[in-house]
Amino acid sequence: MIGVRFSENKCCRNSQCKKVLWLSMLLLTSFIIGCEDQERNNVTWGWGSLVERYSFLSDFPAYDGGIAKYDYQEVEDSVLLYVVLDYVDKPFVVAYFKKLEDSGFEMKSDLRIYKKYKENQNYKLIVEVDIMSITFKKIPLTKEPPMDQSDELALSTFEGIDGATAGNYRAVISWYGASFPLTFDVMCGNGMVGPVNTGRMRMEPAWNYTSTSTMGLWSSAYSAILGCNKALTAINEGKFSRNGVSDEQINNIKAENLFLRALAYFDLVRVYAQPYGYIKANGITGVEAMGVPIVLKDDLSARPSRNTVAEVYENLIIPDLVEAERLMSDSYVRVGVKDVVATVTKPVIQALMARVYLHHEDWQLAADYATKVIKNGRFRLLSGDRFVSMWDGSVDVAPQSGSEIIFEVYVSQSDGSRSDLGDHLTAPEVAGGAGYGDVRVSNDLIDLYDATDVRLTGLTKTNSKYPGYRWSTKFPGKNGLLAYNNVPVLRISEMYLIRSEAIYRGATVSGVTAIDDLNRVATNRNAEAYATVTLDNLFEESRKEFLFEGHVFFDMKRLQKSLVRTDYDLDPLTKNIDFPSYRWALPIPENDILYNDNMDQNPGY
């Protein structure tokens, strides 16, 4: 791991600098202690994403010799840049540091090397991880990082705001393209550690996380929020050069940023807080009712406190989405994109609104917005083999073709982004031996499928070397490369299940029944129809439908279901997790607790 601090020349006697150095040592120590997992479990940044944020890195050699993961932490006027390199080769390290020195950075600390040798029954894996905590003095450069330029300059034109908006999309890749969807399925019994395992994904099924291991989503989501805030401020102040740009164009860009900000806050409050319905029904107050800080201004010196869960929904997520829907044109699609369902359109906004209203327990609004998406006509359920083929790319995902995908995260080798899902989920001996096989489909989930269900027969696969186990084939990669998979965020099948549950709970939709919507999904997958609608049946169908798409943890939270597992052989103390429990709200990252006296940690940590 390479840890680099870029900062202005400051005397290290001041308290802030000492804090930064102390933080560097803390993170370094945490990494060494946690090196058994071979990764920091933090946000994965593509090199291209970091170069966009800090353009002076563009001349540095990009690492292509294995797996590279990047993370950063901004502190005042400094940037702590962490680069985790698996299978590091010495020529790259030499080239990296030579370029740093040539660019005017002065090395101020030392080098520590940690070597790890790991064996399993099939092969001997030798991993050499270089762990460095190095401080550099920054010399002013002629090419400034775009996010560090004057906002007035960078966002002074419509083209600049549009470019910044495109960057905000890429920020979302930082959590959906990483382990965000997979982590929560592994925690809640859909996945389990495979018989061959590289050491990854072992702490998640045991719920063995700490406040230093949950920074990924937090830092990535707030980075996206920061970018959206800057774009929205520029639009609202109207100080940019329009050059013939219409109000409609401006409104569409504003709607995109409102949606992306709402999505980031929605994911944050679902992960780091207890569910809205549980708090409301039990009259919970105090820290246990806390959500996440609402930050609307670009102020790195601010030390915000946490807003309540209700405030995050009612003062930000819902108003942002309502305004985004109002502003966006019915026919708008972002110009020049490679994947039209990886951008915000009006049905995308409406689909997220349906999900948000379900979590907020607004049953009629959840049903109404799910119906808007279903009636839109761009999306439809695919049956049998066509549904299976959708995952290998042989079915066009463009909405004109009637795809199931409403919104997804686009991942491409060409822009430096990547997804961890294919590597972790693909069975060993598949894709030229590239599959890690870290996570298999749990037997608990397999037992729920009917024998004819295409989600079992077409989207899971056995391996002759490991009888009795199945691996998912949902994320086979692009062009034979497992690290590049588009990641679905919203699908049409979810709209049917949302509407079914909302009607079951009292909503009304003319000509539609809850059982019809539930069975529309089940029978399209060649599964038996349900006789009745119950919350357990709805949960089971969602669990089968959205395997490794990150739904199960959030469904269990809002339904207030305890986790009960049979297929589990790790820490017996966390085999089953009751609800309620403090564990359903993950800890706020330790960095934010240390640097913000106004930030309260969740109970239990």
Residue ranges and their predicted role:
Residues 39-82, 136-139:
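Compositionally biased P/S/T/G-rich terminal and signal peptide-adjacent segments
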